[in-house]
């Protein structure tokens, strides 16, 4: 007899042709694609996949965690194979396992990590996985900016203007730029994120690097004290969860 089990999935996807993670009224989403496969496999409409976080349109993931409770007597290898056989080639369930019934992908995720990739050399093969940024990088200024981000701040100036989230306070545990010849990547670890937050941070730090804003101005943005500066949003293609 089938038993209700809590299934954990670790999912990798190329977000280029998705309108983000969350199901929408129209358009292709990662959640929608996987839930469609699950409905087909388990012959039920009672499917509700919970993710550790929601990625925006065009954003990728190397290890998106999700869970769902299902009535099943299938083993995890069978489920993994069935899901991957019913979804597109730009999304893949890497790990599939049964976990404690109390596990919740969103609430159990205390720290979430994002990486943003930039390069100074355009590549047709990598154009959807990194931002080709052709301005010179001031590495010292970028390091100073990233150091300022660590800690607890009000990120009201670094999120989508229409965001209706009550609290815009986030705690940043790690914020660091890494460089290798003409390439770079920015790593951030936080307890939570606001919509477009990482992309606004990356874009605005690069504006400081170009000399368009000062460190003092950037710092004032972190304290939600400067409405005169236009924050710049980096494109989605360089961002990975």
State what each model feature region is.
Residues 1-241:
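Structured-RNA-binding interfaces characteristic of tRNA pseudouridine synthases
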């Amino acid at each position: 007899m089938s038993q209700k089990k809590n299934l954990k999935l670790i999912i990798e996807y190329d977000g280029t042709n998705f309108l983000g993670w969350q199901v929408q009224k129209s358009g292709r989403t990662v959640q929608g694609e996987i839930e469609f496969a699950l409905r087909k496999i388990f012959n039920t409409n009672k499917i509700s996949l919970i993710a550790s976080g929601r990625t925006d349109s065009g954003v990728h993931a190397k290890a998106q965690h999700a869970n769902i409770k299902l009535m099943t007597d299938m083993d995890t290898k069978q489920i993994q194979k069935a899901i991957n056989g019913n979804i597109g080639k730009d999304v893949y369930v890497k790990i599939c396992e049964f976990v404690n019934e109390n596990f919740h992908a969103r609430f159990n995720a205390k720290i979430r990590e994002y990486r943003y990739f930039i390069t100074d050399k355009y590549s047709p093969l990598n154009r959807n996985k990194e931002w080709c940024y052709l301005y010179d990088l001031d590495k010292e200024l970028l390091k100073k900016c990233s150091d300022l981000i660590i800690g607890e701040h009000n990120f009201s100036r670094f999120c989508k203007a229409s965001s209706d989230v009550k609290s815009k306070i986030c705690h940043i545990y790690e914020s660091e730029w890494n460089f290798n010849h003409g390439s770079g990547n920015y790593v951030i670890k936080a307890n939570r994120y606001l919509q477009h937050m990482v992309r606004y941070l990356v874009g605005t730090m690069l504006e400081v690097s170009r000399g368009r804003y000062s460190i003092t101005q950037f710092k004032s943005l972190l304290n939600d004290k400067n409405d005169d500066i236009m924050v710049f949003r980096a494109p989605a293609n360089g961002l990975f969860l």
